[in-house]
């Protein structure tokens, strides 16, 4: 009898202790972001200039994902601290139909991410330097939440996409996305064309 009472008391105590248990939300590591400061990308052999963060590094790239560069003006801006990079491709409108370039930009933003993105929001813009384009904000568990293209519609067409080398998770990437999104928009707003670029080395 005493054994049964002890057993019942133990079960009651165990149940009471666990009845108030609630699942705690998953936590993520706190990120210490650097202070915002910018430097100018102003290589005379490139047909564009812009400002980018001092915590980023510009690397010349011969590929834009699996697409071979058609000219030497394709670059990446790497952010080693955040395992992210901005892929930048440049195309000359004269050698490509403007409508085709715009359609390709929409295809890259929509068709390749629709199955993972919960929403895609295109935002037309005009920069302080009177250049126009569209900024794509992608919601959901995608490897990219920020894509854009910018053009003068007659000669220059530049496309950019911020990607992370990490398992796509909207909640964990949101702080870094928000931080670097400001840098992407700063790049866009400071971008200018250089009509006479010298031959690249």
What are these regions (language model features)?
Residues 13-16:
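C-terminal motif of bacterial Sec signal peptides marking the signal peptidase cleavage site
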Residues 24, 31-34, 45, 62-159, ...:
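Conserved polar/disulfide-associated segments of primarily extracytoplasmic proteins
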Residues 18-21:
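Bacterial signal peptide processing site
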Residues 9, 159-160:
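Active-site-flanking beta-strand signature of metal-NTP-handling nucleotidyl enzymes
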Residues 161-201:
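Surface-exposed amphipathic alpha-helical segments
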Residues 2-8:
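Sec-dependent signal peptide recognition
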Residues 48-63, 187-195:
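Short conserved aromatic/hydrophobic patches within beta-strands of well-structured domains
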Residues 37-49, 176:
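Short aromatic-glycine motifs in intrinsically disordered, low-complexity regions
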């Amino acid at each position: 009898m005493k054994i049964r009472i002890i057993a019942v008391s133990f079960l009651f105590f165990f149940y009471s202790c666990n009845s108030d248990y609630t699942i705690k939300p998953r936590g993520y590591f706190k990120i210490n972001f650097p202070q915002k400061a910018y430097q100018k990308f102003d290589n005379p052999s490139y047909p564009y200039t812009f400002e980018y963060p001092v915590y980023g590094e510009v690397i010349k790239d011969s590929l834009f994902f699996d697409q071979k560069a058609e000219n030497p003006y394709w670059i990446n801006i790497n952010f080693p601290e955040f395992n992210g990079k901005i892929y930048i491709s440049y195309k000359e409108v004269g050698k490509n139909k403007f409508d085709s370039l715009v359609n390709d930009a929409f295809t890259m933003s929509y068709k390749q991410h629709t199955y993972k993105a919960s929403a895609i929001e295109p935002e037309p813009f005009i920069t302080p330097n009177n250049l126009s384009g569209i900024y794509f904000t992608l919601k959901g568990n995608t490897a990219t939440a920020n894509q854009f293209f910018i053009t003068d519609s007659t000669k220059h067409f530049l496309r950019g996409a911020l990607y992370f080398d990490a398992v796509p998770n909207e909640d964990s990437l949101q702080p870094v996305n928000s931080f670097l999104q400001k840098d992407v928009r700063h790049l866009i707003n400071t971008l200018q064309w250089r009509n006479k670029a010298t031959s690249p080395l």
